[in-house]
């Protein structure tokens, strides 16, 4: 199995990740273009898996970094300028895709040949209990709730495939109810 290496060219990395992760196809795959120390950067994450407060603090911190503070490589960047404990590096775009699908946030920067993986995930969970009418002998006891993002995050937690797509649609002339088509 060949490894798809992270390139120093952010546009190439973005093209590959956008295709693999389904950016623009799946509503829950979030992409954010940011500038960190005058370098273009891209953040990828799954809605419902990332802690909003942590991501907000990270973005605020990244925006405040100056060009002079920017290290030459991703290893130094992760050590010096990523204010979060659970940080890893990855040079394989396919592994970055797998990590994003499991809830990790990926940061790629122009000129860096490694991605920075920030584990700020939180998994959706329900209180212990099983549906009263759908008793099963074995298997998952997960059940859906009223919040669609919570439900799609539950599905992503079980099916971590880059091939899974989720399209948000609306049904009903009056209610405009949100529905999600998964394929």
Where are these regions (language model features)?
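Membrane-embedded alpha-helical signal segments
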Residues: 1-182
């Amino acid at each position: 199995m060949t490894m798809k290496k992270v390139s120093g060219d952010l546009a190439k990395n973005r093209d590959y990740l956008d295709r693999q992760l389904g950016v623009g196809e799946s509503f829950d795959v979030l992409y954010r273009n940011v500038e960190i120390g005058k370098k273009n950067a891209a953040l990828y994450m799954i809605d419902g898996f990332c802690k909003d407060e942590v991501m907000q603090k990270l973005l605020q911190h990244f925006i405040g970094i100056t060009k002079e503070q920017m290290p030459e490589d991703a290893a130094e960047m992760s050590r010096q300028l990523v204010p979060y404990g659970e940080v890893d590096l990855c040079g394989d775009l396919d592994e970055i895709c797998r990590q994003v699908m499991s809830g990790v946030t990926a940061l790629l920067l122009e000129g860096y040949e490694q991605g920075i993986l920030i584990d700020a995930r939180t998994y959706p969970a329900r209180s212990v209990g099983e549906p009263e009418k759908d008793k099963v002998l074995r298997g998952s006891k997960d059940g859906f709730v009223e919040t669609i993002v919570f439900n799609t995050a539950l599905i992503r937690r079980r099916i971590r495939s880059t091939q899974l797509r989720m399209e948000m649609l609306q049904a009903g002339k009056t209610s405009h109810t949100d529905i999600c088509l998964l394929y």
